[in-house]
Structures are given as C-alpha cells and as structure tokens.
Amino acid sequence: MRRVFLIFTLIIVACGIAFFFLTKYQPHIVSPLGQLIEKPLDKYTIANLMKRQFIGSQIVLDDAVATTSAFTSYRFHFTSDGKKVTGFVHVPNDASEKNKKPVIVQFRGYVDREKYTPGEGTKRSSEVFANNGFVTIAPDFLGYGGSASPSADVFEERFETYTTALNLIASIGSLSRVDPSRVGIWGHSNGGQIALTVAEILNKPIPAALWAPVSKSFPYSILYFTDEFDDHGKALRKRLAKFENDYDVERYSLTNYVDRIMGPIQIHEGMADEAVPQKWSDELVKVLKDKRKDATNAAELNYFIYPGADHNLMPAWNLVVSRDIQFFSKYLR
C-alpha cells in the first residue's frame, strides 16, 4: 500500500513539473489582428472619407455686412466636426422660401494667415454670381477669419479643409432660401485641389468650375511650393518623412481617384500663370478625358486656355467669370 501511495505521489509531482515548464516556456502567440491599430490620420484617407456620412449643422447668418440692389452679403458660421468655421455668403434679394436659389460653394486658394481678410480669393467672383441669381457661400477655413484653430499637425490641418468643405455642403439644406438639390462647386488654385478631392469623395454629378487648380499628386503638390518658404521647406520635409513612415501617401492623393469625378467640369488656365504650371491642367484634362472616353453618358468637360493670363486669370477675368455663369446656369437653373 505504501508503495502504491509513493508511485501515485511521484506521478503527481512529475505532472506538476511538466505543467510548470510547458506553461513557462511555451511561445507566446500574438494574433495579427490584435496589432491592427488605427492611426490618427487614417480617417482622412480618401477611401475612408468616402465611407463617412457627413451630417452637417445649422448655417447661422450673422449680421449683414453689405447690401446692393441685387444681393445682400452676410458673415456666417457653422460647426464642422465640433469646430466653429466662419465665412461669407451672398444671397440674391429675391431669394425666399418660395423662390429658393441654386448655390455655388466656393473654395479659395492659399492665403498667408496673417494677411488674410474674410472673403479674400472669392469675394469678387461671388458678387458677380450673386448678381446673376446664385447664392454663393465660401468658408474662411480653420485658422482664418473668426474660425477655430486647426490641428497642430500640418497634415491634419490640410485634411481638415476637406472635412470642412464636406460638412459645409452637407449643411446647405439648413439655409431656407437655398435649394440643396442645386449645388455647384468653384475652386481656385489650392481651392481647386479641395474641389477635386470633394468631387471624388462625393461621387455625385455636381458641376465644378476650376481656376488654375492644383491637381498634382500628394505630397508633390505641396513640396512644389516650398521654395517660397523661409527654410525652403526643410521643416515640412522632416515632418513628411515621418508621415510617410507611418502612412501610405497614395491613399491621400487625389490623382488616384479621378475616375470618381462624375459631374461636368470646366477648367480655366492662364498661359502666363507662374504659380500653377499650365501643364498640370493639361495633364488633368487628359486624364479626365481618358477616364470618361468609354462612358455612355460622359459629363461635359470644358478646358479654356488664356494667352497672357496670370494665376488670377487677369486680364481675361471677365470672360472667365461669364463662362462660369453660363456653365452653372446650364446645370443649376
């Protein structure tokens, strides 16, 4: 009996030792799914913005700042992703809840923050559009006018221009004198880049007029202009190196999603433009034509080149804006 008890005890001890070593030295297997951690700027990839539903907010018209016989200009504000964004809106005087007007959403080009004044880059064209029966609305963007501060991250600040634009378009229906089913987009320079990206994300037949648009791939589209920086872009390139280490830049580049632009497009380019090379617009038009050549009902594509015209389309400005009035009237009336 004692012998049986001893054997039983030895078996128990042996099992305990075996269990100890098996559990202590067994390789630790980590599920690859557990390492798929979303990074902060992943939400701004064009593909992810396509999936997002933009709900919008109330556009609040603040005090009227100017009134003419044809329209009234207001400062406005709305909320974009929890941040206040201000801007300018021009409303034809005959607009009402029973006579709703089409709207042109305008995106300006780059302006130095310290030199910016509300309406800069859009005010002159918006007044002409309003004179011709269109409501126009242009955001200052975060960090400008009376808007809240943008992200401290230079790349997120850029991506916030897209979400601001998309939230603004989603908010159009809150204006009682505007017909939200008749929306056009206008963009100049970097605002053209915003307009193109918005058109890709929305993937709707929205008419867009683009003046000398920045249309190259990201991040080349920003590196191109760094020779104007005090440090010639050294700090930005350093941040970009880190960004490229963490993210796939191709997922943020509008050039990879041009086939999603569904609406009619009208592009204007000055042959004497020293800010945006004419060849950029030449290449954009070629890509758009190639993407649309097999479409059964391809949307209209107009491309106008102006000899001697600069980045602001001077001295052809009057002709350019008159062509845009005809263009928007065709699709929004």
Where are the regions a protein language model picked out?
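C-terminal catalytic histidine-bearing segment of alpha/beta-hydrolase fold enzymes
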Residues: 293-333
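N-terminal cap/lid segment of alpha/beta-hydrolase-fold proteins
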Residues: 53-98
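Alpha/beta-hydrolase active-site loop
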Residues: 155-176
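Short beta-strand/loop motif that positions the catalytic acidic residue
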Residues: 261, 267-269, 273
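N-terminal targeting or regulatory segments adjacent to alpha/beta-hydrolase or S9 domains
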Residues: 1-70
